[in-house]
Amino acid sequence: MVGVLALQGGFGMHKVILDEIGVQSIFVKNEIDLLQTDALIIPGGESTTLSILIDRFKLRASILEYSKHKSIFGTCAGMIMLSTSKKLINKVKTLDIMSFSVMRNSWGTQVYSFEKKISLKKFNIPSFNAVFIRAPKVKSIGAGILNKESIDFKKNNSSNSDKEVIILEDNRHMACSFHPEIDGDTRVHEYFLNKYYYGKE
């Protein structure tokens, strides 16, 4: 059973993807729900609100214990929550589960959201449209990260470009800065499930 954290954000669209793949899933709103699952997706949304609700519903300790034995996939705000920070990121208390740090809303506000056709060669996922909505940028990466994919982004009003990490994984968890649930393409979810849920990769 795959759980989708359903406190805030785009949890419904993740469940639609899981249903399309044919994976049994439930919405996770408390510890009892969490304990029924073998993998967890933390969806995009508003990371400050998500951080507050994780504490309000007393899920922080449960998720941290869960992460020691089972896999978590975080998208956008979920990526922020999985990251490590020595101090609060604009009032967001991260879960410190994966060894990387981020900057929130680094592409700008909602009006600067965008789609970009990308390929994730290191994840065996060919071309698809990735949707970035107030996406975080990866600032630093620790030794625990085993695989990552960077793509080129042009700077505003410039011919120069920067390489930005948009997806990464360690030996148990995975996080991405885009929203793989939005365009209906199931391949990013399938990669996570095959590797960390079914153990096929």
Spans of model-derived segments:
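C-terminal and late-domain segments of enzyme folds
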Residues: 9, 113, 134-201
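Redox-cofactor binding/interface segments in oxidoreductases and associated redox assembly factors
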Residues: 42, 74, 176
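Pocket-forming structural segment of enzyme catalytic cores
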Residues: 87-164
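Beta-strand-turn-beta hairpins that frame and shape the catalytic cleft
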Residues: 1, 125-128, 168-174
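Cysteine-nucleophile active-site neighborhood
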Residues: 47-119
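Hydrophobic anchor at the start of a short beta-strand
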Residues: 25-26, 72, 173
